[in-house]
Amino acid sequence: MNEDKLESKWLFSLTESQKLYLLISLIINKKLPEAKFVYKLLDYTKGNWLSLLLRFLPETTDPECYIPYIDIDSHYGNIKASVNDIEPIVLPDEELCQLRLTNMKLWNCKLPSLKDEAEFYSLFSKKIVEETDLVDLAYQLTKNSQAPAEIQQWNSGTFTVFHKLSQFAAVPINLEEMEAATIRDVISLAFPVLDSKNCVFIMDEIITVFINNSSNDPNLISENWDFVWKKLLQLVKTDGLAVVHTLVLNWNTIEPKLFLKLAKVALASCYISDDSSLYSVSLARDITEAIQNKLNFSDVNFGDLLKKPHDFSADGLLSLQNDLTTPSSLSTSLLMEITKAIALLTQLKVPAPTFKTSVSISCSNFDSQIKYLENVLLNALGTIQSPDYKDWHDLYSYIERFKQLSLFFLNISEDAISVVFLKQMLQEKSFLALKQMRNEIGLKDIEPKVLIDCLKTSFYENFRAASNMNKNRGKLALACKVLDVFVDCEPTIDLRRRLNSLVNACSLIQPFKLILEPGKPLSPSLVEANLNPDKLIKTIFSQNPSAYTLYDDILALDIELHKAAGDFDYSQVFTELRRITEHMITLTIDVSLEKDDIEYAKQIVEDRLMTLAEASEDVKFFLYEIAYKIGKFPSNHPNAKVIRLDMLQIAIANAPRQKLDEVVSYWTDFQSNSKVLEENLNTTDVEFHSSKKIKDYEDLEDANFDEEWSKAADLMSDDPENQVLYEGNLNSSLSLNEDPSVSDENLTQKVTSKLTNGLGWVLGVPPRK
């Protein structure tokens, strides 16, 4: 390639292609005065000039540098006076210039041409924005005074909006696009970058300007603003309340009518937001206070707003019929109370509900509010391992404050709240704290049926989980504590007595190690499932051979079993105790006699039954029956004779008049028969006697007692040791070692003497001398 170095008048010697190539080079290098001079040397149109500027002028060029040269025919722009003022430029030769121009499609073809300057302004401003994102340069181009009228008008409206918006977001625009832009286009560009720092500027300088310049139709303007508010509400759902908070507090140039709309959006924003953090709550409180101050609202009773459900959709919240978001003293008062309630829940370390949820709970029915209260308590206690009185007291105080706020628990009475606390404290096994708070939560004022249900539920929760039978340990001890909580609650007295006796029975039955069901260890639940007093006592006697000797323990157990089974009339305590005692004495003596332990049977009569007989005339007949039964029992016990005689004398002493002859007759015959037996035993070898003792008694049992006792009567002795019968010493025994003597004394006289003196003991008459 050959290049020519031009001299001082080199320009006029250039070929057409070299001049065009030079013109392009000058435009590219932003040398517009020189370019305008060269253009004058070429036979090109104004449209060609504008086309070359559009194509080759760098987009980053300061508009002030080329604006004077856009109108090539105007007097604006400094044209060099002479060719000498143009510095020589080294250009390619003609052939090379033509080749390069051909590649740029500027040679051997029709040059591109723009229609007019307005087209250049539009296209070059678009090119600036698309290539550099420097919208401000395009804005400077279109706002200058030399721009065509249509460009200036467009710049003052639509392009101003996009120019201002370009500070925050990329704005790909051209004249056609800007002219066709709608509020949707502006919002789609503006809202993604909207934040608390730029929201006032964007809403005031961009959104408002665009809507006002886009139409003069009031209906269209209203529709555009409705779209803005709806999109702003959607933005809150994803980005939070910060933007709305800033707008309400700092958008001071907003028109009063628009502020009412903004206030509605702000109130709706609080309900549509899913964030209930302290930060969001503080923003909501600021928003509400600002609306109250600017619109002169006051705090009022908002109860009417919570009497019906509300639509929390975006359209529902922005509806003119929605009283919840329509700016008023009612709506702002409610929102302020919700902020206080959420703050209280946050202090309790409870997950705070959203504003929407708070209203929904407050409008809900009794069951829903109870469930929410239970969740509040559970969450509040979630971080406390063993809540004490202070924890429960503070929690109860918080709930009372909620009631004062008229939120959440509107349909729950004080008693219902007390019941929830009662159940939860029982569940947490905070028995000591519950006893301390009985008056505070009004335990005694709770409905009786509810009290009983709570008692049963909590008691059996622990009782049926118990494996240990000791009432002072484990789950059984907890069951006792449940009963202790309700000690002052009169409606529960019958149930408490029965359940307390059930616990006592479990503890008393433990030492006997019963097997109630094969393969199952003894447990409180098993005792309850087999709660039949007679059956249990008999099972103890059958599985524990010596259990009948533990009379006091068995009696105590039997009493508790009857109480636990509901077979005990507390209005007649002494009657019931006597009934159970008589039954137990009968059962114990029956078992004793079955085991031929007549001595223990005698002990029961003397130590237990006679004491009862002294205190009650009604027991004497029972004493007679028992003593007579023992007296007639054919025992093989070594002291059987003495014991039986003692028992027969006790029977005589307590027999009713109609039974007295029978007992006396039996006692007389038995005593006489005993003398014959004594004589026979003394004439027999001792060892033989010992080995045959049981057989002899069996033979005696089968013999004719009347005949034997008649023979024995002849052998009755007047031994002084027999006088113990008449001295009234109930703890002494007749000796079996008396020596029988034969006397000529009339048998009738002796029997009469014995009988008379025996009755004397019964009647308190001294014996005959």
UniProtKB/Swiss-Prot annotation:
Keyword annotations from UniProtKB, A to Z? Endoplasmic reticulum, ER-Golgi transport, Membrane, Protein transport, Transport
Which GO annotations describe the biological process of this protein?
intracellular protein transport; retrograde vesicle-mediated transport, Golgi to endoplasmic reticulum
Question: How does it sit in the bilayer?
Answer: Peripheral membrane protein
A single GO cellular-component term from the record reads: nucleus
Give me the disulphide-bonded residues. none
Entry-linked InterPro entries: Sec39_domain
Query: Where does the source fall among the domains of life?
Result: Eukaryota
> PANTHER family in the record, alphabetically?
PROTEIN TRANSPORT PROTEIN SEC39, SECRETED PROTEIN
Q: How does it assemble?
A: Component of a peripheral membrane protein complex consisting of dsl1, sec39 and tip20.
Q: What is this protein called?
A: Protein transport protein sec39
Q: Which organism is it from?
A: Schizosaccharomyces pombe (strain 972 / ATCC 24843) (Fission yeast)
Per UniProt, what is the name of the gene that codes for the protein in this document? sec39
